[in-house]
């Protein structure tokens, strides 16, 4: 029963379309109709600016964190990372936004933060360093996933390794168009770093 309750809560948390809410409430803009059309932090940064993008990033991280922290607080008999994955699914396929969501990078990070804060710090550091060097958000997301997968070896936790593998695969798959644009030289670079 715990899996059903916390799984549903996690999916619904993940389904909260932060970018859509910030865009409509703060700017009277449906972010899905601009830029990449993606309901994520990167599109929000590009279309609405740093303040809105930062709010969406933090909100998306919080969704993943809450999904993993709540079962721990209630001492639920569940595999917490499996529950966290449902928040990631909710972010990608949100019931509150016609199942058209984001790429789940921030929500995945938040999920890890709720269980493995040190791994989260390593992920953020990897992301920012790669972003500083490459100026590509998509490439930074992919490299962060792959580095995180390598680092999970040190945790000697098979479940964590499987979940991080799944998250890395999801991130790579969700960025397949970005990968094509990087190869073609048409992927937008950031200019603020």
From Swiss-Prot:
Annotated organism of origin: Oceanobacillus iheyensis (strain DSM 14371 / CIP 107618 / JCM 11309 / KCTC 3954 / HTE831)
Keywords: Cell membrane, Lipid biosynthesis, Lipid metabolism, Membrane, Phospholipid biosynthesis, Phospholipid metabolism, Transferase, Transmembrane, Transmembrane helix
Compartments, record wording: Cell membrane
GO molecular function: acyl-phosphate glycerol-3-phosphate acyltransferase activity
GO biological process: phospholipid biosynthetic process
Family in the record: Belongs to the PlsY family.
Pathway: Lipid metabolism; phospholipid metabolism
Residue spans crossing the bilayer: 3-23, 54-74, 76-96, 111-131, 146-166
Protein name (Swiss-Prot/TrEMBL): Glycerol-3-phosphate acyltransferase 2
EC number: 2.3.1.275
Membrane topology: Multi-pass membrane protein
